[in-house]
Structures are given as C-alpha cells and as structure tokens.
C-alpha cells in the first residue's frame, strides 16, 4: 500500500484522525482508481470531493464540451473554458484542488467493449450521466467486472443515489431502470436547481470513499431519495429482479 508523504499527512489530517478511518483508510484512498463517467453537474461535484479527499487516481470520461448553460451547476467549469472538452476543463480545475493525485482525461464516446475494458482497470465507477442507455451500458460493464457502481441522478428539486456492489442476491441498475422505462427526463427539458446537484454529487463521493476505504455501510440494495422542496430524505428497498437480463438467474 502506498505511503503518505509528510505533506499528504498534513493535508488529510482531519480524515486520518477519524476513528476507524486512520492511516489505513487514507492510504486505501491513495491507492484507489476511480472512473467518473460524466463531467457535468454531478461529476463536477463528486470529483472535487474525491480529489480533495485524496483518491489517488481519477479517470474522467466524457465526450461533451463546456457550454454557457452548464455554468449554473457545473462548478469545475468557467467562462474561460467554454468550448473546451469537459474532461480537460475538469482536469485542470481538479489539479488546482489537489496536485498530489493523478488525473487522466478521456475525451471519447466508447463502445461496449472499450467501456468494459476501461471499467476493469478501476476499483469503482461513478455514474454521473443523465442518459438511461449509457447508465445501462455502465451497469453491464460493472456487473461483468464486479466493479462497484455509485449511481446518482438529479432533476427539478429531487435527487437520488444508489450503490451497486454486485454481491450475490443484490440488484443491479437494470433492475431499477426496468421499473421506470427508457424515457427519463433530463435537466434540459425539466430544469434543475444548482445546489441540488451539489448535494447528490457529494453523496456519491461519500459513498465512493466508504466503499474504497471499507468505512461505514454503503447505500446498497436501496434507493436513497432527497426532496429539496421539503429537505427530506427517504429510502426505498430495491430488490433484484429474477427476470433481469443482466443479473437475473
């Protein structure tokens, strides 16, 4: 396991002193490789906390460029980076947040085989996309490689998060998407409040850190929903669908 430098020990001191986390947890983060898919609102929010917390290797995957309408909620981008690939804009911002980590941008739209190969190189994947087809593609790749997937979504004033560990008897994302169909609304059509994105992205980062460090209990086997209008959280148990084409028997 990678050892922390003196600078890193000072930088991450407030995490290292947490009971049950300690140096082992911080070194586990430094050793970890996380793939973040989508560098829009959720990806920006989640990645900056993974970077600042000391996750040692981040791969950023997106094929989009920064536009002016993104800046309301995509906090790593700026007026100066409008027109740039999102992964490059995000890489530069994250490097300023933490120069001690390695960041690899991948500005591409990958096919199933390419995505599966990339997933297999990582310890955990964050789904920060807004497209059900891409989410299903990610789920299939993560299930095949048994790489945990932390999935988040946010629209209007509502958000949700789920962790898929792919353990025996656990559901997968396809079990969830089968319940709601393929035609999910996007922020372009329905709108979204900026801080809601930060709440859900931060929850994704927290769940990722817990999984990577073996710290706490992940939000697996359930959907955690947040209603920003009333500031209320609720949970719904998510069962594995025996007829699921990905994880079903």
Swiss-Prot record:
<keyword id="KW-0548">Nucleotidyltransferase</keyword>
<feature type="binding site">
    <location>
        <position position="62"/>
    </location>
    <ligand>
        <name>ATP</name>
    </ligand>
</feature>
<feature type="binding site">
    <location>
        <position position="175"/>
    </location>
    <ligand>
        <name>Zn(2+)</name>
    </ligand>
</feature>
<keyword id="KW-0479">Metal-binding</keyword>
<protein>
    <recommendedName>
        <fullName>Molybdopterin-synthase adenylyltransferase</fullName>
        <ecNumber>2.7.7.80</ecNumber>
    </recommendedName>
</protein>
<dbReference type="GO" id="GO:0046872">
    <property type="term" value="F:metal ion binding"/>
</dbReference>
<dbReference type="GO" id="GO:0042803">
    <property type="term" value="F:protein homodimerization activity"/>
</dbReference>
<dbReference type="GO" id="GO:0005524">
    <property type="term" value="F:ATP binding"/>
</dbReference>
<dbReference type="InterPro" id="IPR045886">
    <property type="entry name" value="ThiF/MoeB/HesA"/>
</dbReference>
<feature type="binding site">
    <location>
        <position position="244"/>
    </location>
    <ligand>
        <name>Zn(2+)</name>
    </ligand>
</feature>
<dbReference type="InterPro" id="IPR012730">
    <property type="entry name" value="Mopterin_Synthase_Sase_MoeB"/>
</dbReference>
<feature type="binding site">
    <location>
        <position position="172"/>
    </location>
    <ligand>
        <name>Zn(2+)</name>
    </ligand>
</feature>
<keyword id="KW-0862">Zinc</keyword>
<comment type="similarity">
    <text>Belongs to the HesA/MoeB/ThiF family.</text>
</comment>
<dbReference type="InterPro" id="IPR000594">
    <property type="entry name" value="ThiF_NAD_FAD-bd"/>
</dbReference>
<dbReference type="GO" id="GO:0004792">
    <property type="term" value="F:thiosulfate-cyanide sulfurtransferase activity"/>
</dbReference>
<dbReference type="GO" id="GO:0006777">
    <property type="term" value="P:Mo-molybdopterin cofactor biosynthetic process"/>
</dbReference>
<keyword id="KW-0808">Transferase</keyword>
<feature type="binding site">
    <location>
        <begin position="130"/>
        <end position="131"/>
    </location>
    <ligand>
        <name>ATP</name>
    </ligand>
</feature>
<dbReference type="GO" id="GO:0005737">
    <property type="term" value="C:cytoplasm"/>
</dbReference>
<dbReference type="GO" id="GO:0016779">
    <property type="term" value="F:nucleotidyltransferase activity"/>
</dbReference>
<feature type="binding site">
    <location>
        <position position="41"/>
    </location>
    <ligand>
        <name>ATP</name>
    </ligand>
</feature>
<comment type="pathway">
    <text>Cofactor biosynthesis; molybdopterin biosynthesis.</text>
</comment>
<dbReference type="GO" id="GO:0008641">
    <property type="term" value="F:ubiquitin-like modifier activating enzyme activity"/>
</dbReference>
<dbReference type="Pfam" id="PF00899">
    <property type="entry name" value="ThiF"/>
</dbReference>
<feature type="binding site">
    <location>
        <position position="247"/>
    </location>
    <ligand>
        <name>Zn(2+)</name>
    </ligand>
</feature>
<keyword id="KW-0547">Nucleotide-binding</keyword>
<keyword id="KW-0501">Molybdenum cofactor biosynthesis</keyword>
<dbReference type="GO" id="GO:1990133">
    <property type="term" value="C:molybdopterin adenylyltransferase complex"/>
</dbReference>
<comment type="subunit">
    <text>Homodimer. Forms a stable heterotetrameric complex of 2 MoeB and 2 MoaD during adenylation of MoaD.</text>
</comment>
<dbReference type="GO" id="GO:0005829">
    <property type="term" value="C:cytosol"/>
</dbReference>
<dbReference type="InterPro" id="IPR035985">
    <property type="entry name" value="Ubiquitin-activating_enz"/>
</dbReference>
<feature type="binding site">
    <location>
        <position position="86"/>
    </location>
    <ligand>
        <name>ATP</name>
    </ligand>
</feature>
<dbReference type="GO" id="GO:0008146">
    <property type="term" value="F:sulfotransferase activity"/>
</dbReference>
<keyword id="KW-0067">ATP-binding</keyword>
<comment type="function">
    <text>Catalyzes the adenylation by ATP of the carboxyl group of the C-terminal glycine of sulfur carrier protein MoaD.</text>
</comment>
<dbReference type="GO" id="GO:0061605">
    <property type="term" value="F:molybdopterin-synthase adenylyltransferase activity"/>
</dbReference>
<feature type="binding site">
    <location>
        <begin position="69"/>
        <end position="73"/>
    </location>
    <ligand>
        <name>ATP</name>
    </ligand>
</feature>
């Amino acid at each position: 396991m990678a050892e922390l430098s003196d600078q890193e020990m000072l930088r991450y001191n407030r995490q290292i002193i947490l009971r049950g986390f300690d140096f082992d947890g911080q070194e586990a983060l430094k050793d970890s490789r996380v793939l973040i898919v989508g560098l829009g609102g959720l990806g920006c929010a989640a990645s900056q906390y993974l970077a600042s917390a000391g996750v040692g290797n981040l791969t950023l995957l997106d094929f989009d460029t920064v536009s002016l309408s993104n800046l309301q909620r995509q906090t790593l981008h700026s007026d100066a980076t409008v027109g740039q690939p999102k992964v490059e804009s995000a890489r530069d911002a994250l490097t300023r947040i933490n120069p001690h980590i390695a960041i690899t941008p991948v500005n591409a739209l990958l096919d199933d085989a390419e995505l599966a190969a990339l997933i297999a190189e990582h310890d955990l994947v964050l789904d920060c996309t807004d497209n059900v087809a891409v989410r299903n593609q990610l789920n299939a790749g993560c299930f095949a490689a048994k790489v945990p997937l932390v999935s988040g979504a946010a629209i209007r004033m509502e958000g949700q998060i789920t962790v898929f560990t792919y353990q025996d008897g656990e559901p997968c994302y396809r079990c969830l998407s089968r319940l709601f169909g393929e035609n999910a609304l996007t922020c372009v059509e329905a709108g979204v409040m900026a801080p809601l994105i930060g709440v859900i992205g931060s929850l994704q980062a927290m769940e990722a850190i817990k999984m990577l460090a073996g710290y706490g209990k992940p939000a697996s086997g359930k959907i955690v929903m947040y209603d920003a209008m009333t500031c209320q959280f609720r949970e719904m148990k998510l069962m594995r669908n025996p007829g699921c084409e990905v994880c079903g028997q």
